[in-house]
From Swiss-Prot:
Keyword Ribonucleoprotein set for record: no
Reactions that this protein is recorded to catalyse: L-glutamate 5-semialdehyde + phosphate + NADP(+) = L-glutamyl 5-phosphate + NADPH + H(+)
Domain of life: Bacteria
Gene from which the chain derives: proA
EC number: 1.2.1.41
Entry protein name: Gamma-glutamyl phosphate reductase
GO cellular component: a single term: cytoplasm
Enzyme class: oxidoreductase
Coiled-coil segments on the chain, per record: none
NCBIfam families in the cross-refs: PRK00197.1 (NF001221), proA (TIGR00407)
Amino acid sequence: MEAFLEEAKASSRVLAGISGADKNRILKEMAQALRASTAEILKANALDMEDADRNDLTPALKDRLLLDESRVEGMAVAVEEIAALKEPVGRVLDGWVTEDGLKIEKVSVPIGVIGIIYESRPNVTSDTAALSFKSSNVCVLKGGKEAQHSNEAIAKVLRAVLKKNGLPEALISLIPDASREGVAKLIKMDKYVDLIVPRGGEGLIRYVSENASVPVVKHDKGQCHTYIDEDANVENAIRIAINAKVQRPGVCNAMETLLVDTAIAKEVLPLLKEAFDAAHTELKGCGETQEIIEVAPATEVDFDTEYLANILNIRVVDGVEGAIDHIVRYGSGHSEAIITENITTAEAFLNGIDAAVVYVNASTRFTDGGAFGFGAEVGISTNKLHARGPMGIEGLTTYKFKIYGSGQIR
């Protein structure tokens, strides 16, 4: 592991000499190479899917793992979108002249070597490799064993493009050890790795956070809520709630708990139940919810659970303050939404919720680097330092100060 990471670290010096135009050209070549290698990538993914069936992976994990022609095309498009982004490094973020006549520039620079630990999403391999290359970082990829064949096939395609352009293949490094022991080694290698971004289940993220000596940017879990206010447009509220839960329930920006203002609960809950029943959603509710519609009881544990499945908690709350109180207690700081036509209430929610992303009249499913216009994302951070929310190109940079003098001493 150490020799592997030492090679990755050494390769980072090459990136300083690559122009933005050359990086963009190479990224476009990577996108075309992914398209040209679709058959090989899908063949590798089929092996992973066979293993998934044998190992009884959950439907949510299988959905994340599965690749088809459209998803490979989506990977290629994401790489092209990353190529089209503004050059993130070498930008002068601020500048001034001191009383001593020193000219100071605050300039964006790459972080260095970024370790990405992820589970069952093969597209993370191409997304994070492209984002890292665009931002002049080396990426060290540690995928889960359930996607090992797919990750190896994708990384092979990208590394071949690097080699063709005379660049070290170590700029995109895939750790061959897909075991938990491999994670344990990687997160201690602060001599070679500058940042760790874990993407996966709550257990993985907690393990990395508690054991890493390398700085970590993470989200704990996607405990997302939608609050339907008494001044909501009911038709919009139902559409948004269905999308937030049902469109793709196995992802971190899917809603897990729906909060409904007591003032409109009797009107809107029967309509919501009809819509969720049609979507085959398993509903659990608080006592007041159970008095209005027929649902299973929701426990305190349920309100603290990230289901990643088509299961939804419902709680009736006393206005926006009741919604905020619930989210403060159970939220994970990921994404929260209010549905209301009342601007004052909306602002109270926006200002009262401490989360990476807070919505008014929109689905939490938009918390995504692509949806934000970032091209793709390395992950979604609930940290408050360095990066927060969908972590795109800018989250992969830091800064340094360049100071120009003319002989000044102190």
